[in-house]
């Protein structure tokens, strides 16, 4: 999930986490995220989602059913890896811990989720929350190239960070985190100061040039999801080095 927020003046920032050395893509700066868990598709959680049905979500992703689980997974992973919970209270207001006692309860819920406990539905029920699935914009679909030993089928989403919550990495799978303008992140990558992988780079390029998060989300939500193509890079050896190509680039269909 590309977690974004407005900055003073014009423009926006995106939240990046540095992967721990022991994990896949160790040392790289990536977006928070992970796999869809079994609980994400539970009926209990479906009833706790605001504004998006499984039919709508599945249609957007081009699958028969189960699409809403991706929206739920985005919110869960955002909470696990960034400490940001995209949710509404029962009165319709955005969730924001009211006091230290409530904040401590949610720190404990996050800890349990990071330990693998399927407690998202329990948390929503006990705290009377609804997941803000209507505040996500579906952005991109990437598949890991065939040369990789581990392959992933990944959907990317955009979400606006709510005011009043502070994003922070989990200290386990991620060891550092930054808020940074997408243009600055790309510049630091070019200068060798920030390690990033191709999907991160290309998705950052896709959110450059927007004046604020409202403009970004409105633009991405206006795109017909059927027009979001699946991107599967191809890598091949040239002069002793791997060269990567994307669909539509010259030479892609030759490999």
Spans of features found by a protein language model:
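N-terminal leader/linker segments that precede catalytic domains of diphosphate-processing enzymes
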Residues: 1-255
């Amino acid at each position: 999930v590309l977690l974004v927020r407005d900055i003073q003046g014009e423009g926006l920032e995106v939240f990046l986490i540095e992967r721990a050395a022991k994990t896949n893509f160790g040392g790289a700066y990536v977006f928070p995220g992970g796999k869809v868990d079994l609980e994400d598709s539970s009926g209990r959680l479906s009833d706790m989602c605001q504004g998006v049905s499984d039919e709508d979500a599945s249609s957007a992703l081009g699958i028969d059913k189960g699409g809403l689980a991706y929206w739920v997974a985005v919110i869960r992973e955002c909470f696990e890896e960034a400490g940001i919970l995209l949710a509404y209270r029962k009165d319709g207001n955005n969730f924001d811990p009211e006091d230290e006692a409530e904040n401590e309860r949610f720190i404990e819920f996050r800890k349990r989720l990071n330990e693998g406990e399927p407690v998202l539905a329990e948390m929503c029920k006990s705290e009377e929350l609804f997941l803000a699935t209507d505040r996500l914009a579906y952005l991109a679909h990437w598949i890991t190239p065939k040369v990789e030993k581990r392959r992933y089928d990944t959907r990317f989403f955009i979400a606006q960070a709510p005011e009043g919550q502070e994003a922070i990495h989990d200290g386990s799978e991620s060891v550092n985190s930054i808020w940074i303008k997408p243009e600055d992140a790309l510049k630091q990558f070019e200068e060798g100061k920030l390690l990033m992988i191709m999907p991160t780079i290309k998705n950052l390029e896709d959110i450059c040039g927007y004046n604020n998060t409202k403009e970004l989300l409105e633009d991405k939500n206006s795109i017909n999801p059927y027009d979001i193509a699946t991107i599967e890079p191809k890598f091949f050896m040239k002069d002793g080095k791997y060269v990567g190509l994307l669909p539509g680039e010259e030479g892609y269909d030759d490999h």
